């Protein structure tokens, strides 16, 4: 049996774990961080940074991550890292990206969007001016989002305020809400583009990957193949930036709809102007009107009640 040993830094260890996630083993030898078991190769990563490849495909698998030093391929070998950072390997792939909007806004829903960008369309989508939606004005969002939606397959899930408040009262933290919404949105898009399979699925990170999947333990369907949870993912792949823009576009549309319903232009965010708007709704429509347009557990609710009471 062929054995190959490579030395890995933390970045490479993370990349290895993500790449072989579907074959991770629960049985770990002493000193191991993780182990991978496939029919043709067993890979063991140790706390020391050593990674051992064993089996018929050991040379092939190790070669994906390292540059040969010219040693006898039949012997245990050391290799130098040549693998670029994970982010650089992902940016040119055909990928699904997902992002959410509305989690920090008192008024309005949470919107999760996912977009699929084929590698042949990356330049075209980027040329539309796609970047993190937080860097774009509302006017720019209304201009760019429809162009993205005409070009890239996408899926959207909206958690309205009434449902959000029910979930929150049941004890569900917002991080789990987001995990459920991302998973369901990804499932819709994966189905929509089938039989095409994305080479990667990139979630703008709000939880570490393990914590994200623990939130999905009770789901009947979990999208897990090739899923990466990465910070600032909108700068990793244009698909995430596209999803961010679509999510914000839908959020803005929902905010306009809610504003018409309550007869008041609802402000974004959770600052003092939001307290005043909520207090006005309470005075004009009653506190119960907030149930369908606001996230009631935010501190803004108490502040608005105090304002409405003393005016």
Curated annotation (Swiss-Prot):
A divalent metal cation binds at residues 99-100, 204. It is found in: Cytoplasm. Manganese or magnesium. Binds 1 divalent metal ion per monomer in the absence of substrate. May bind a second metal ion after substrate binding. Its cofactor is Mn(2+); Mg(2+). Pfam families: DUF3378, RNase_HII. One of its GO terms (biological process) is mismatch repair. Disulfide bonds: none annotated. Residues 93-310 form the RNase H type-2 domain. It catalyses: Endonucleolytic cleavage to 5'-phosphomonoester. Keywords: Cytoplasm, Endonuclease, Hydrolase, Magnesium, Metal-binding, Nuclease. Its EC number is 3.1.26.4. One of its GO terms (molecular function) is magnesium ion binding. GO terms for cellular component: cytoplasm; ribonuclease H2 complex. Belongs to the RNase HII family. RnhC subfamily. Endonuclease that specifically degrades the RNA of RNA-DNA hybrids. PANTHER family: RIBONUCLEASE, RIBONUCLEASE H2 SUBUNIT A. This is Ribonuclease HIII. It comes from Geobacillus kaustophilus (strain HTA426). The gene is rnhC.
